[in-house]
């Protein structure tokens, strides 16, 4: 996998919830769903290159899949990895496109 491919596959999508919305307003922390192979350095490099911002810190956690039932069949949702990315002072990522 080339370095450009790895950058594009590292950050999957922003994770939007009430908690993450509050974090982005309060202390410029953006939350992303990232690839299972990604580590802190990979996420930092990908966000800095893709969004042209300066990253101050990255915290990563694994989210376990939840048990689900489909009638008699028991299953699980897939596990995924979440990254809390704190941006440096004066930097911001605008996903909506409004100014």
Swiss-Prot record:
One of its GO terms (cellular component) is ribosome. Pfam families: Ribosomal_L23 (PF00276). GO terms for molecular function: rRNA binding; structural constituent of ribosome. Disulfide bonds: none annotated. It comes from the Bacteria. GO terms for biological process: translation. Keywords: Ribonucleoprotein, Ribosomal protein, RNA-binding, rRNA-binding. One of the early assembly proteins it binds 23S rRNA. One of the proteins that surrounds the polypeptide exit tunnel on the outside of the ribosome. Forms the main docking site for trigger factor binding to the ribosome. PANTHER family: 60S RIBOSOMAL PROTEIN L23A. Belongs to the universal ribosomal protein uL23 family. Part of the 50S ribosomal subunit. Contacts protein L29, and trigger factor when it is bound to the ribosome. HAMAP family: Ribosomal_uL23_B (MF_01369_B). This is Large ribosomal subunit protein uL23. It comes from Francisella tularensis subsp. holarctica (strain LVS). The gene is rplW.
